[in-house]
Amino acid sequence: MDHDVAVRTTVASPTAVVAQATTWQEFPRLWGSLLDEVYAFVRAGGTTQTGHNVMLYRDDVPNVEVGVQVAGPFAASGRVIPSELPATRVASTVHRGPYDGLTAAHDAVHAWCAEHGHVLTRTRWEIYGDWREDPDELETEISWELAAPA
């Protein structure tokens, strides 16, 4: 699949998340339980979901935040905390298709940035579009923060 990559400026988007330091080997087994914690909090009236599921990776450890886009600030409860997707310049693409193709989309952003002289930070995130029963119809927005020009 081809991934069109573009540079854009994002606006901050409030989120309700569980933050966790993990490993890349553990993360595929972990993210579902983290998201379940957030949804239990939202269903209990802790905040109002206004957007999609998100995964924010702050670095390569990875230190991750798994959660949902929400209306605004709220009081933390247990491991669910307020956070946000940052307002920043990013290189982004939309992956259309099954989630097992997300690595190719991330690789496409890296390749495009290398070709066009952009330097990436380690901060990146995925915004998962509306659920579709057909995996070929899934859409996931991938954004990588760009380093400030030297």
Model regions: which residues?
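A solvent-exposed interaction/effector surface
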Residues: 1-150
